[in-house]
Regions:
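C-terminal non-catalytic interaction modules
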Residues: 1, 11-84
């Protein structure tokens, strides 16, 4: 996924642009059902990670707990790995 490449490569401007366009795409599409919540949560968590970039230990812990408590998250495994 392009999101992973941008985040792991440190391309923050490109990642932010991708998140904005992906969010707009999700708003336009009405036929994707439950996938919308999964991807909206992914976007929300990646934005939180970007706001505190580079991640401090306290921010990692807070976001990791929030990801674990949220039921519908796309790419949960990748998010948890980034927050180790």
């Amino acid at each position: 996924m392009l999101l992973r490449i941008y985040y792991e490569g440190g391309y923050t401007e490109a990642l932010e642009s991708l998140l904005v366009s992906f969010s707009a795409y999700l708003r336009r599409r009405t036929d994707i059902g439950y996938h919308r919540a999964n991807f909206e949560n992914l976007i929300r968590f990646v934005r939180q990670m970007l706001r505190t970039y580079p991640l401090t230990p306290a921010a990692k812990t807070r976001i990791r707990e929030e990801v674990a408590a949220t039921q519908q998250v796309a790419e949960r495994g990748w998010l948890m790995k980034q927050l180790e």
